[in-house]
């Protein structure tokens, strides 16, 4: 059975320091098929050029790089979603990473139950801060008052 495409969308703004690590974490995934859509949001540093170099280095067509005038991460993220072809959308900020098993495990959960609308995992800090990022346990009432779901979570494209 053919596995569904996962579209990883990444807004990029002055993220030269972390971008390669974020992209490498996606490429190192044990899941296929993936597409990685990078939208540079008017970076003043070398982020856009680095993104282009990473796409060329991957040489698989999996990474697509776009540029827009600075409009903020939400606009860049939504633009990336408009370009995405995957059944599933996974936003990943340019200063974040994803584990190698996440996509396979998240797709399995979502394919097994159409009622599941979002899949996310525990998170850890890296860089200057270390340790576990303590997320509140999921509850509908808490979600209505305070979003405890991190941006790096998998959604059905049809629900975006």
Predicted segments with their positions:
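Nucleotide-sugar donor-binding/catalytic module of glycosyltransferases
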Residues: 1-160
């Amino acid at each position: 059975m053919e596995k569904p495409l996962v579209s990883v969308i990444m807004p990029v703004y002055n993220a030269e320091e972390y971008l390669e690590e974020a992209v490498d974490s996606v490429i190192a995934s044990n899941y296929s098929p993936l597409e990685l859509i990078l939208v540079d949001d008017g970076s003043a540093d070398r982020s856009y050029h680095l993104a282009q170099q990473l796409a060329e280095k991957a040489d698989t067509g999996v990474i697509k790089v776009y540029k827009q005038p600075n409009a903020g991460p939400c606009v860049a993220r939504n633009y990336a979603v408009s370009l995405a072809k995957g059944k599933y959308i996974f936003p990943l900020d340019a200063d974040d990473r994803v584990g190698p098993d996440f996509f396979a495990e998240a797709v399995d959960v979502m394919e097994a139950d159409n009622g599941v609308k979002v899949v996310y995992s525990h998170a850890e800090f890296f860089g200057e801060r270390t340790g576990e990022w303590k997320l509140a346990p999921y509850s509908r009432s808490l979600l209505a008052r305070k979003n405890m779901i991190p941006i790096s979570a998998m959604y059905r494209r049809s629900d975006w």
